[in-house]
Amino acid sequence: MAVESRVTQEEIKKEPEKPIDREKTCPLLLRVFTTNNGRHHRMDEFSRGNVPSSELQIYTWMDATLKELTSLVKEVYPEARKKGTHFNFAIVFTDLKRPGYRVKEIGSTMSGRKGTDDSMTLQSQKFQIGDYLDIAITPPNRAPPTSGRMRPY
């Protein structure tokens, strides 16, 4: 007698991320590119084997959170430690349909404040080994507005 599995796609998708044992799992090399003007790099800066010059190489795991990555970037760039500095994260990945790269914004963090994206992981955002991480850093004096509205009244 044959037994048929009745697992639905929703059940598969809702399965929580399995914790990674950092003692037993080898870390991956994460190539991070940063800007300090609040904007991500242009995709043509990643063309034909070229990459932006602002590369930071981090050994980490797929369960690394955006807050954890923010802390690592702040260790290297002291000016990013100021309270209110905004970090906007994007994954840069190879476009399988045409030559070049695509970008997918995944979340943001802020120095000195807790945020909803702090606990977001690379794994939860479908990051794959070989992708790049692009971080647009905005200093506190030029930070984007916290609310979506800019009204004079």
Curated annotation (Swiss-Prot):
GO terms for cellular component: ASAP complex; cytoplasm; nuclear speck; nucleus. GO terms for biological process: mRNA processing; negative regulation of DNA-templated transcription; negative regulation of mRNA splicing, via spliceosome; positive regulation of apoptotic process; regulation of alternative mRNA splicing, via spliceosome; RNA splicing. The modification N-acetylalanine is found at residue 2. Keywords: Acetylation, Cytoplasm, Isopeptide bond, mRNA processing, mRNA splicing, Nucleus, Repressor, Transcription, Transcription regulation, Ubl conjugation. Residues 7-20 have a biased composition (Basic and acidic residues). Residues 1-20 are annotated as: Disordered. Residues 93-153 are annotated as: Involved in splicing regulation activity. GO terms for molecular function: transcription corepressor activity. Gene3D superfamilies: ASAP complex, SAP18 subunit (3.10.20.550). It is found in: Nucleus; Cytoplasm; Nucleus speckle. There is a cross-link at residue 13 (Glycyl lysine isopeptide (Lys-Gly) (interchain with G-Cter in SUMO2)). Component of the SIN3-repressing complex. Enhances the ability of SIN3-HDAC1-mediated transcriptional repression. When tethered to the promoter, it can direct the formation of a repressive complex to core histone proteins. Auxiliary component of the splicing-dependent multiprotein exon junction complex (EJC) deposited at splice junction on mRNAs. The EJC is a dynamic structure consisting of core proteins and several peripheral nuclear and cytoplasmic associated factors that join the complex only transiently either during EJC assembly or during subsequent mRNA metabolism. Belongs to the SAP18 family. Found in a mRNA splicing-dependent exon junction complex (EJC). Component of the heterotrimeric ASAP (apoptosis- and splicing-associated protein) and PSAP complexes consisting of RNPS1, SAP18 and either ACIN1 or PNN, respectively; the ASAP and PSAP complexes probably are formed mutually exclusive. For the ASAP complex, the association of SAP18 seems to require a preformed RNPS1:ACIN1 complex. Forms a complex with SIN3A and HDAC1. Interacts with SUFU. This is Histone deacetylase complex subunit SAP18. It comes from Bos taurus (Bovine).
